[in-house]
């Protein structure tokens, strides 16, 4: 069994597919040469950001499309159109989360292939609990939100004598994030919408409970000047979204409004030792489970080693 990956992918999705292939004893190959696709010594074709019609490759080839085609689909995209009955058993497009599927369907009537919410697996071996000393009550992660929300959170944490460290999204390396996770009792996540939310889920994989200041829509994401990124759609679309695409009460607490922070924070602190976020991850978000679900949708029967 062999998977051929053609075209650009976000490094985290690529890493997930590569590890998943190892888990399932599937050979992985990357190419940026289009003609390579037509040498049919492989079984699965992954196209993260390119549309290639299933009719242009051998019929025995299974195809995974996505997730990097667009922010919002448009009617002129070649993947958009009535569902093709001849293709639906051998290929699909993954948006990674239900809210993303719903937004896509709000912009176009249908895709020519099934559009599914199939997340990519996490590296639970790397993102795992360890015995590091917990020196922070909270790691505060801030990503693309109104700065007033961050300042309010800081004021609340300080008023409760909490020790915390702030990570501004885009200003740190992955290893730094992992190191700080392991030194923290919990994470206060003040972020935007997430198609999957690898970093959110990696905290859970480390068994670090999350206190999430969740979003209701894409309109809560702002640029460096505090202007909503998706302002052109205000009054035209709802753009309903979430920060946490996979969630359970054992992962922590979620709130939406500033006035909910103090009470939710107190609940979180009181219940801190009762959360088991890694248990949720191991049940739902491992490479074996996530890639296994993709294989099942392609009618490929393989067991992870």
Language-model-detected regions and their locations in the chain:
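A short, active-site helix/loop in glycosyltransferases that binds the activated sugar's phosphate group
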Residues: 90-112, 147-149
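Acidic donor-binding loop of glycosyltransferase active sites
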Residues: 182-195, 216
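Short alpha-helical segment that forms part of, or immediately flanks, the ligand-binding pocket
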Residues: 178, 201-205, 219, 224-226
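A charged, aromatic-enriched C-terminal amphipathic alpha-helix characteristic of glycosyltransferases
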Residues: 249-302
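Short hydrophobic beta-strand element within catalytic cores of glycosyltransferases
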Residues: 209-212, 232-235
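Conserved catalytic-core segment of nucleotide-activated headgroup transferases in glycan assembly
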Residues: 103, 120-177
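N-terminal pre-catalytic "stem/leader" segment of glycosyltransferase-like enzymes
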Residues: 1-56, 292-305
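Active-site proximal beta-strand in glycosyltransferases
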Residues: 44-50, 56-77, 94
């Amino acid at each position: 069994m062999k998977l051929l990956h053609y075209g650009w992918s976000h490094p985290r999705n690529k890493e997930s597919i590569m590890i998943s292939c190892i888990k399932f004893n599937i050979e992985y190959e990357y190419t940026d040469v289009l003609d390579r696709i037509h040498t049919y010594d492989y079984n699965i074709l992954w196209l993260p950001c390119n549309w290639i019609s299933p009719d242009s490759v051998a019929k025995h080839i299974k195809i995974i499309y996505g997730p990097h085609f667009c922010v919002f689909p448009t009617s002129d995209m070649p993947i958009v159109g009535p569902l093709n009955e001849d293709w639906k058993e051998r290929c699909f497009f993954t948006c990674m989360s239900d809210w993303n599927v719903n937004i896509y369907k709000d912009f176009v009537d249908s895709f020519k292939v099934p559009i599914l919410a199939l997340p990519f697996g996490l590296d639970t071996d790397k993102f795992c609990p360890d015995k590091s000393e917990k020196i922070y009550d909270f790691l505060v992660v801030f990503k693309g939100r109104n700065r007033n929300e961050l300042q309010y959170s800081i004021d609340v944490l300080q008023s409760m004598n909490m020790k915390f460290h702030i990570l501004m999204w885009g200003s740190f390396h992955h290893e730094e994030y992992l190191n700080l996770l392991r030194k923290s009792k919990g994470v206060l996540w003040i972020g935007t919408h997430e198609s999957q939310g690898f970093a959110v889920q990696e905290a859970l994989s480390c068994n670090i409970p999350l206190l999430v200041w969740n979003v209701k829509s894409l309109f809560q994401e702002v640029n460096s000047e505090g202007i909503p990124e998706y302002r052109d759609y205000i009054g035209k679309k709802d753009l309903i979204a979430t920060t946490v695409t996979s969630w359970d009460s054992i992962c922590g607490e979620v709130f939406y409004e500033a006035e909910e922070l103090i009470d939710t924070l107190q609940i979180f602190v009181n219940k801190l030792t009762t959360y088991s976020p890694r248990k949720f991850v191991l049940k739902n978000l491992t490479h074996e489970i996530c890639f296994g679900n993709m294989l099942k949708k392609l009618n490929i029967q393989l067991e992870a080693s």
